[in-house]
């Protein structure tokens, strides 16, 4: 046998190199991974493993078999006797040295028998050959004698007859020789057949012994120890069944015994227990009643903890997690309580929590990504490879009323601001403008504080931010917020100093204020371009456009024009006649009419596309804003728009996203922890203002909801019962009536059926077109729900000059009113050395023995304090009243 390396041997044995090296070390042989192993070292390792993994020397098997025997008794009744047969077998394992010695003796005996057999065969061959030779010689002698007699008798025959006789004799001799050779060949074949049968018998015996002892040669240590009892018990049980079968063979010669005897080659042969049960049934009597049971001892592995591979999705309930780990739900809840979280068996937990619990209980966690379908749909898109220059997307940002829309208005030469309520931009407007030097796409964002999220979306979807600052107003709160959004998005800023034509304009002050927030002009060594413009007079507009195009040229903006389009939702709303409408800004590719789009939780086929002027278009390239129709619902502003191939898969992805959003929302709900329970117990009564909100566009719904929720205080909370895009319907009115809510419509109206419900239920319906008015009126409604503030106001002081005793009232204080007025039945305080020693109320107020209701400053009176008699000279009685002050929401 050639030498092999440790690595090769490890691969053959299907074990690790480190484990094989450790086994060699345990056997006293030091090896590394690249060393070779000789046959002798291999044998040493096998002997070591066999010695290490040898099982117990003695194995005892006990078996019980129970059956019932019915014995006829007196009175015609049979008596049942329980019979229990106990058997005990002990199997002793031979010592390895003794086994080797016995094997050597058996081998020597087999060799001796083989040698004797060969000698016997050779001797038989020699005897047969000698016998054949003797017979041939005797036959030859007899034939010679006969021939001599015939020759003597026939001397007179002619010479030709003598020649014929000689030829016949020669032929007969050849025949006899052939018969002798055939006999010899048959003897050799018989000997060879006996040798082959003996060799097959020895090989079969060796193969059977090798199979029985196979576990001692190749199995791993852990496998040996775990399978030993099973294999040994099987062999022992087979041996016992064989011996019992031999004993039983001589007993039953009748029909039942023949029926019970297993047929040769029957794979479904009955076990010993079945045979004993059948014999008990035969002995049971005429009725064939059988009340026997077989108790058979089994060998089972002891129960122990099983570590499993637990596959966990993004969300999972506690019960599902318990099923995956094959444990009871109470054990999982107990483990979560140890980790500091309380949960019920049906509660949805997130992936991180489930991972902690499973690892705490000793299982291996496999985190599953549930968005394989979404990734497959997104990867199956035909996008072109060549990128071409595209138009810049410019967002105009700044404080409210600083002239953003007017500036864009002048650029587009249309009056947009007049259409906006109150002159304030309520949602994002997307327009593209053709100039002499190229095309520019503008996004006009609101400047009011309520529209923070809309400004953030505008900054994320843009390439360049034009920051409009009024020269007469300077930097304002929304200006600072716009700077923060631009920096967060990493977008360059071009500053347009507007209203430069006003007399009080101060551009230098604007530069100084902006420099404090990191916006430095180029002449000061910064990177931002400052352009002085006037949206009213049209001053500096061309310079602003040149600055934008210059900045775009520096950025080297490129996009893929061919292929399937992708973009973002700038705004969305529900049109009564057209259905869901979404304003989409295409980022790359070309969007065609008829494309299948996937947009957040919604999907659909583009039925129509319109530009910002309301004109029908068939396609839109990069940096082009369009309105699309045909979606299944109103998408959320900011969602990604992607063109896909298959509408069915798009629907599946949209439904998956909806379910995922719902599961994550449930998983993130507030958990029932002890501190929350105590907080809920100590929390007082909280008033709620319920509102059902409907607006014209999705961005307005978000902005108004955020602003109203920020108004909530500890005493009064704003609760948005329902919100949506579109007009107020009968469903909205019914919801408001059921939840006692206020109906608020922002740039929308109620339809006829909704108005009937509103009149019948006397609901509070309010329309708004400017967000200021909406927020102010909700503040007023919340202020009315605030509990009034109670304030103590001192109305008079009386100094005790003397104390009198009255049988009816006890101690009466003779007082002089020094300040204000003293009123009867008002609460008072008794002060001694400017320290309050008693607080109560006046019981009696008299002047010249007459009861009076009040005593004014500078007059004397007698005061009786209710339930208090320790009034002394020099005390001061302070009279006050409690007034209510109505609070307001700041």
Curated annotation (Swiss-Prot):
Residues 541-668 are annotated as: 5. Its main location: cytoplasm. Residues 498-501 are annotated as: G4. Residues 444-447 are annotated as: G3. Keywords: Acetylation, Cytoplasm, GTP-binding, Initiation factor, Nucleotide-binding, Protein biosynthesis. Residues 104-287 are annotated as: 2. Belongs to the TRAFAC class translation factor GTPase superfamily. Classic translation factor GTPase family. IF-2 subfamily. This is Translation initiation factor IF-2. It comes from Escherichia coli O6:H1 (strain CFT073 / ATCC 700928 / UPEC). The gene is infB.
């Amino acid at each position: 046998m050639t030498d092999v390396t440790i690595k090769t041997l490890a691969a053959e044995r299907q074990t690790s190199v480190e484990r094989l090296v450790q086994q060699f070390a345990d056997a006293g042989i030091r090896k590394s991974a690249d060393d070779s192993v000789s046959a002798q070292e291999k044998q040493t390792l096998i002997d070591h493993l066999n010695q290490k993994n040898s099982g117990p020397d003695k194995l005892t098997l006990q078996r019980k078999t129970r059956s019932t025997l019915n014995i006829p008794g007196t009175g015609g009744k049979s008596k049942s006797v329980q019979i229990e047969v106990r058997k005990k077998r002990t199997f002793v394992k031979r010592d390895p040295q003794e086994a080797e010695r016995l094997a050597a003796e058996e081998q020597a005996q087999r060799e001796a028998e083989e040698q004797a057999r060969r000698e016997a065969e050779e001797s038989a061959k020699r005897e047969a050959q000698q016998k054949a030779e003797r017979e041939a010689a005797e036959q030859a002698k007899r034939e010679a004698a006969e021939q001599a007699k015939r020759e003597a008798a026939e001397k007179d025959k002619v010479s030709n007859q003598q020649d014929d006789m000689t030829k016949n004799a020669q032929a007969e001799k050849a025949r006899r020789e052939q018969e002798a050779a055939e006999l010899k060949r048959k003897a050799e074949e018989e000997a060879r057949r006996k040798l082959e049968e003996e060799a097959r018998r020895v090989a079969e015996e060796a193969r059977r012994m090798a199979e029985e002892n196979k576990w001692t040669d190749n199995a791993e240590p852990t496998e040996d120890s775990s399978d030993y009892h099973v294999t040994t018990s099987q062999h022992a049980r087979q041996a016992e069944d064989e011996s019992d079968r031999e004993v039983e063979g001589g007993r039953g010669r009748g029909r039942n015994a023949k029926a019970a005897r297993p047929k040769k080659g029957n794979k479904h042969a009955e076990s010993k227990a079945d045979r004993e049960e059948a014999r008990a049934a035969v002995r049971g009597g005429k009725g064939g009643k059988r009340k026997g049971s077989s108790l058979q001892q089994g060998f089972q592995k002891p129960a122990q903890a099983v570590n499993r591979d637990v596959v966990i999705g993004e969300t999972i309930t506690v019960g599902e997690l318990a099923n995956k780990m094959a444990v009871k739900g109470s054990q999982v809840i107990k483990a979560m309580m140890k980790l500091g979280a309380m949960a019920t068996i049906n509660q949805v937990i997130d992936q991180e929590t489930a991972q902690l619990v499973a690892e705490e209980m000793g299982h291996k966690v496999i985190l599953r990504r549930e968005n394989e379908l979404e990734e497959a749909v997104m990867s199956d898109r035909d996008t072109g490879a060549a990128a071409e220059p595209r138009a810049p997307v410019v967002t105009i940002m700044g404080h409210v009323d600083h002239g953003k829309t007017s500036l864009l208005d002048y650029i587009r030469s249309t009056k947009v601001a007049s259409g906006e309520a109150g002159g304030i931009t309520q949602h994002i407007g997307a327009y593209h403008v053709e100039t002499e030097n190229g095309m520019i796409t503008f996004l006009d964002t609101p400047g009011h504080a309520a529209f923070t999220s809309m400004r953030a979306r505008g900054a994320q979807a843009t390439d360049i931010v034009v920051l409009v600052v009024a020269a007469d107003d300077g930097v304002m709160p929304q200006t600072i917020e716009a700077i923060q959004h631009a920096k967060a998005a990493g977008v360059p800023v071009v500053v347009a100093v507007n209203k430069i034509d006003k007399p009080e304009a101060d551009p230098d002050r604007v530069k100084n204020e902006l420099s404090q927030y990191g916006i430095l002009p180029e002449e000061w060594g910064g990177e931002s371009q400052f352009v002085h413009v006037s949206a009213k007079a049209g001053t500096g507009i061309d310079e602003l456009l040149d600055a934008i195009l210059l900045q775009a040229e520096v950025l080297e903006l490129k996009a893929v024009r061919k292929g399937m389009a992708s973009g973002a939702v700038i705004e969305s709303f529900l049109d009564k006649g057209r259905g869901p409408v979404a304003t989409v800004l295409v980022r790359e590719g070309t969007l065609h009419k008829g494309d299948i789009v996937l947009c957040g939780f919604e999907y659909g086929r583009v039925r129509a596309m319109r530009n910002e002027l309301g004109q029908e278009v068939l396609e839109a390239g990069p940096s082009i804003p369009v309105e699309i129709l045909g979606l299944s619902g109103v998408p959320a502003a900011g969602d990604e728009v992607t063109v896909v191939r298959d509408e069915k898969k798009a629907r599946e992805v949209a439904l998956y996203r909806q379910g995922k959003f719902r599961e994550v929302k449930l998983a993130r709900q507030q958990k029932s922890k002890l501190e929350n329970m105590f907080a809920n117990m100590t929390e007082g009564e909280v008033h709620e203002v319920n509102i059902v909100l409907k607006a014209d566009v999705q961005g307005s719904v978000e902005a108004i909801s955020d602003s109203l929720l920020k108004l909530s205080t500890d005493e009064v909370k704003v609760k948005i019962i329902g919100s949506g895009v579109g007009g107020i319907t009968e469903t909205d009115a019914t919801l408001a009536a059921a939840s006692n809510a206020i109906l608020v419509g922002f740039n929308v109206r109620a339809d006829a059926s909704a108005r009937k419900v509103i009149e019948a239920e006397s609901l509070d319906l309010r329309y708004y077109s400017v967000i200021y008015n909406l927020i102010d009126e909700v503040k007023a409604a919340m202020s009315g729900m605030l509990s009034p503030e109670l304030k103590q106001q001192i109305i008079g002081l009386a100094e005790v000059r003397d104390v009198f005793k009255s049988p009816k009232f006890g101690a009466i204080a003779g007082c002089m009113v020094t300040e204000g007025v003293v009123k009867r039945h008002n609460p008072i305080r008794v002060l001694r050395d400017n320290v309050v020693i008693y607080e109560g109320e006046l019981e009696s107020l008299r002047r010249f023995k007459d009861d009076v209701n009040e005593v004014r400053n500078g007059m004397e009176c007698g005061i009786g304090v209710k339930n208090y008699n320790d009034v002394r000279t020099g005390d001061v009685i302070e009279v006050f009243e409690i007034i209510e002050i109505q609070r307001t929401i700041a």
